């Protein structure tokens, strides 16, 4: 299968360009600042530079970033408001993600994927989030959690069975959290009891993202509660398995187009062959995937904040009060400069964590830093943007209030901000 960049570049020729008109409909894509347009990585060693800037990308990464930006503006932006109001992701958006190759970015071409870099995944999530954070997290979960776990821990048979489906048509869902297992995720109560060649799952899960559309559920259940978290094991459960019940989607503040549902398991029989990896290693797999996933969430929050910022700045440059532009007031200039600096810092933290992961270097502390900081900054940025736009920013006629609502989840899911601070402090303690 030809690479993602090639396919996207071919498709991009069919996409028309859109430019923001100040205070036009929020379906129109936002202005993009020059500072966020990074250059491709060209002749670095020839120029005597041994270490490229973090915002310098390979040709493939630049093509992916550019093509996903066009896809998001053309095919997602016109539907964002409707999807938010209806709490439903449009089928055309999901189909588009698969058709563009965005649901199997790092998966080997042997299984129908693209075989691109982890930073490519980060760039895709960031660009999608500039337009709609719901679509971004839909893509993020598939790539950083589901695909990654199967790629790393699946048997050859499991890879051959599931990866081609996950890259072309099937949505995956990661099932860890429970009513009594949120931040304390390994206090889960879902059981998996062995009966012959099967394991029988009983219990429930909460806050399961993408559950409404998922065809495959990666479920964490305990095969031996007497040994605590060391009994947690990963199971691959197909949607049509008898006894698996998917509840009504939650009515959420933000990320409304991304379904979040409770699940119930009533004597769900799962073949022993559907155990992912080793028995009792589920907690290790979950920790590992969440460490990577936190970089993905950092990218989501970064993109969300940048998208909101890009939409707002043209307004304050054109809005006239007291005979001059809002942007000409020094007090507002300082606020804008402060937010822009924070966005740049969040971007560098996120890209650095991604590059460390790609290089096989320790990255857990840096991933937590990126996730923590980007999430906090997303909340601050979107709040400021509403203030800068004034009354219109508070209405649903424009996207700023949605960015604000979507941003809040960043400090909560895939490890709350305080959990990230705990992780960072733990590593600092060990370093000294």
From Swiss-Prot:
Substrate binds at residues 183, 229, 283, 291-294. Belongs to the acyl-CoA dehydrogenase family. It comes from Homo sapiens (Human). GO terms for biological process: fatty acid metabolic process; isoleucine catabolic process. The modification N6-acetyllysine is found at residues 70, 284, 426. SUPFAM superfamilies: Acyl-CoA dehydrogenase C-terminal domain-like, Acyl-CoA dehydrogenase NM domain-like. This is Short/branched chain specific acyl-CoA dehydrogenase, mitochondrial. It is found in: Mitochondrion matrix. Ubiquitously expressed. The modification Phosphoserine is found at residue 183. The active site is at 414 (proton acceptor). It is linked to Short/branched-chain acyl-CoA dehydrogenase deficiency: Autosomal recessive disorder and consists of a defect in catabolism of L-isoleucine which is characterized by an increase of 2-methylbutyrylglycine and 2-methylbutyrylcarnitine in blood and urine. Affected individuals have seizures and psychomotor delay as the main clinical features. Pathway: Lipid metabolism; mitochondrial fatty acid beta-oxidation; Amino-acid degradation; L-isoleucine degradation. Its main location: mitochondrion. The lineage of its organism: Eukaryota, Metazoa, Chordata, Craniata, Vertebrata. Its cofactor is FAD.
């Amino acid at each position: 299968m030809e690479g993602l960049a090639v396919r996207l570049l071919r498709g991009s020729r069919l996409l028309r360009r859109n430019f923001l008109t100040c205070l036009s409909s929020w379906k129109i894509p936002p202005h993009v600042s020059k500072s966020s347009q990074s250059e491709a990585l060209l002749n670095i060693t020839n120029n005597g530079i041994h270490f490229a800037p973090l915002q310098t990308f390979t040709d493939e990464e630049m093509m992916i970033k550019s093509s996903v930006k066009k896809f998001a503006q053309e095919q997602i932006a016109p539907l964002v408001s409707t999807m938010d109001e209806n709490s439903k992701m449009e089928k055309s958006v999901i189909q588009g993600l698969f058709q563009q190759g965005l649901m199997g970015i790092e998966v080997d071409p042997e299984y129908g994927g693209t075989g691109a870099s982890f930073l490519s995944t980060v760039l895709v999530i960031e660009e999608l989030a500039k337009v709609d954070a719901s679509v971004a997290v839909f893509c993020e979960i598939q790539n950083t959690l589901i695909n990654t776990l199967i790629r790393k821990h699946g048997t050859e048979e499991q890879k051959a069975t599931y990866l081609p489906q996950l890259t072309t048509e099937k949505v995956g869902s990661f099932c860890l959290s429970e009513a009594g297992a949120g931040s304390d995720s390994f206090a889960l109560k879902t059981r998996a009891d062995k009966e012959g060649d099967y394991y029988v799952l009983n219990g429930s899960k909460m806050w399961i993202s993408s559950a409404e559309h998922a065809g495959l559920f990666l479920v964490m259940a305990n095969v031996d509660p007497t040994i605590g978290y060391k009994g947690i094991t990963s199971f691959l459960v197909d949607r049509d398995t008898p006894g698996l019940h998917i509840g009504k989607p939650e009515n959420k503040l933000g990320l409304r187009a991304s379904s979040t549902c409770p699940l119930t398991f009533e004597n769900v029989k799962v073949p022993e062959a559907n155990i992912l990896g080793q028995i009792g290693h589920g907690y290790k797999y979950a920790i590992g995937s969440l460490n990577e996933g936190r970089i993905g969430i950092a990218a989501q929050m970064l993109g969300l904040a940048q998208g909101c910022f890009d939409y707002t700045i043209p307004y304050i440059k054109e809005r006239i009060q007291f005979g001059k532009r809002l942007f000409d007031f020094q007090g507002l200039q300082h606020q804008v400069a402060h937010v822009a600096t924070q966005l740049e810092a969040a971007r560098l933290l996120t890209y650095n964590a991604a590059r460390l992961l790609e290089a096989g270097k320790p990255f857990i502390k840096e991933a937590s830093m990126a996730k923590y900081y980007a999430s906090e900054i997303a909340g601050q940025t979107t709040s400021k943007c509403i203030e800068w736009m004034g009354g219109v920013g508070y209405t649903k006629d424009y996207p700023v209030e949605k960015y604000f609502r979507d941003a809040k989840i960043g400090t909560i899911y895939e490890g709350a901000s305080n959990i990230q601070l705990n992780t960072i402090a733990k590593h600092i303690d060990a370093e000294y």
